[in-house]
Amino acid sequence: MTAVAVVGSQWGDEGKGKITDFLSKDAAMAVRSNGGNNAGHTIDIDGKTFKMRLIPSGIFAAKDNTVIGNGVVINPEVMFSELENLEKNGIDTSGLRISNRAHIIMPYDIKQDEYQEEAKGKNKIGTTKNGIGPTYMDKASRIGIRVCDLLEKDTFEEKLRTNLEIKNELFTKVYGKPALKFEDIFDKYYEYGQRMKKYVTDTSVLVNDALDQNKKVLFEGAQGIMLDIDEGTYPFVTSSNTISGGIASGIGIGANRLDTVIGVCKAYTTRVGAGPFPTELLDETGDRIREIAHEYGTVTGRPRRVGWFDSVALRHSKRVAGINGLSLNLLDVFSGFDKIKICTAYELDGEKIDYYPASLKELYRCKPVYEELPAWEEDITQVKTWDELPENAKKFLNRISELVGVPLVTVSVGPDREQTIVLKNPWEM
């Protein structure tokens, strides 16, 4: 297979960075298709930890190019900060390519995000306030500024002046906030465009050419399927399509070009921000998992909400994203536990259901139906093969695979690349 997609199958933070780094060592190209610097990913390599929000994880290993596609929204300041940190640590970034059709997060988008969230009061979504949503709003409203616009001084000036009129009207008259000044933005962002120029190309052509040549291309999804703008827990979702279908439009490839879709999940479930979470643990067990696994947001630093593994949510993700392989992370967290629970269904108003409701009110009334399994005492962080795993760990993994209806391809027992048990090679599925 030459096209493998990696998507988060929960609410993000599943550890996609690790599996994409692991797979990218065999890839000619690693491609990101959606989101922006609201999507944190952590990579541990040779004792060094890299926390990134925008540059694709494949930057560490992909042989030819690392690509930021047209579906990504780019904060230039964040991007150049990450590039500088990578280069300072000896990582070659010369293969980075940026779509000329990608949209730019402008200062007014960040302000709008902040003001909108503030105005919602108790109904706030829990946005990272990085301007992601407003940038996608600009895109849908056809007033967005794209990378290609940033490279053309006259075009950029015209669009910026027009947009500032629109945004300042909103800021001053609706939110009662000060107007932004053209001169505080124009020179700085035009300079970003000039610095960006060497990376910019038509990435749709680049990626399709690689696929036509049967090169291995790894597609990195951001966030998680349960945050998808259409299929997630709306309105507590992100602003882009995080399912595998969003990869095609976010890169500019045909939907039939993906060979394999790997869904990444944790051995439990986490969520950041507001929204329904049927298996959430608000007790000592939840606190224990959070501290063992250091469940704090890469972007925000906020403590993540923690719950038991939810197979109902995973089956939903499998269906809407066409997942045909599971990559499970953080199995080692349960070493030393007595029992582990898996949610097998929900109870809604006294009725047992096995699907994920669209209605928020229904979701908030759902109670998880649990199956309890024994855990294990052994430290598994040095385990290299399936046969070395404790029997109870194998039973837990097999039950997850059975409930979701998807085979496991990798199991992670620690943060490093080497702490990965490979059951099936995604490149050969």
Curated annotation (Swiss-Prot):
Annotated CDD domains: AdSS (cd03108)
Molecular-function GO terms, alphabetical: adenylosuccinate synthase activity; GTP binding; magnesium ion binding
Ligand binding (substrate): 298-304
Catalytic residues in the record: 13, 41
Cofactor names: Mg(2+)
E.C. number: 6.3.4.4
Residues binding Mg(2+), per UniProt: 13, 40
SMART domains: Adenylsucc_synt
GO CC field: cytoplasm
Catalytic activity, reaction form: IMP + L-aspartate + GTP = N(6)-(1,2-dicarboxyethyl)-AMP + GDP + phosphate + 2 H(+)
Residues that bind GTP: 12-18, 40-42, 304, 330-332, 412-414
GO BP of this protein: 'de novo' AMP biosynthetic process; IMP metabolic process
SUPFAM superfamilies per the UniProt record, alphabetical: P-loop containing nucleoside triphosphate hydrolases
Family label: Belongs to the adenylosuccinate synthetase family.
Protein name: Adenylosuccinate synthetase
